[in-house]
Amino acid sequence: SELARSRGKRVGVAVALSLAAVTSVPALAADKVVQAGETVNDGTLTNHDNQIVFGTANGMTISTGLELGPDSEENTGGQWIQNGGIAGNTTVTTNGRQVVLEGGTASDTVIRDGGGQSLNGLAVNTTLNNRGEQWVHEGGVATGTIINRDGYQSVKSGGLATGTIINTGAEGGPDSDNSYTGQKVQGTAESTTINKNGRQIILFSGLARDTLIYAGGDQSVHGRALNTTLNGGYQYVHRDGLALNTVINEGGWQVVKAGGAAGNTTINQNGELRVHAGGEATAVTQNTGGALVTSTAATVIGTNRLGNFTVENGKADGVVLESGGRLDVLESHSAQNTLVDDGG
């Protein structure tokens, strides 16, 4: 894994530096060390060169470190930001790798054309273009990352991404399988904005909070999603997924699939809540003009302009259908006190 490689390389670098210090033997020609208090501006890393940064490195271009692929343990080379080290305005391009270790900081990095950043420290204002990737490992924090077309951010368990802007991942259509573009979350993602064509996938162990989704963007929930606002965007809650405090505004959909659950959803005018058979939505607030699409094989409990309503155990009571709303009453099931209004 990227994390294993980072840790392994960190040990190797430390041993090499310690040996050089003790024996007064200079580092290998391919290893460029930026000492604490030193600043290096511009330069290029190629052909398995290493830059080991304890001080400050600005404007570097990195084109080595991933020649054997992102999953190969045989990779060497790249830029290594150590504890206290700082890298600014770096470009990581084809086959390039930037490793930000615990206590290290990278800012204003552009990663493109298959380059990657392995993060156990802090990364600020990273831009991912055209197969550029960022791997946020345990203890790593990425803030202000922008994920453009075919870019990919993976937030591992124990990692944190905050203020991410996602512009890719859903080009194949809503809830399609674009596994390695957009954002995939096993750790925590906070204050994310998902724009047209953007996708956030929250895996079983993942948590997303305070997410804003615009038209053409979507969120796939297999873990937990808290405080999501759908401004025309879509949220899909899969089996074992949980979404709490979702607000559905005009053009937005929340889709709760079999085995998924939603709590405290608010449906505003021209927003839509869809609950599939075997799905569950409780504490729903259906405001005037909001649509509910479900069947008596689902569980939906909440309030609407008539008062309390329920759909559970094959019985529906007090449901309001409008603005595209629909209730399918299955064989041997029942519905009472249903109001079918404009567009229902």
Annotate the PLM regions.
Residues A30, A36-G43, H48-N50, G55-M60, ...:
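The right-handed parallel beta-helix/beta-solenoid scaffold, focusing on the short coil/turn
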Residues V22-S24, E133:
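Intrinsic disorder/low-complexity segments in short proteins, especially the signal peptide
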Residues S1-S18, V22:
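Bacterial Sec-dependent N-terminal signal peptides
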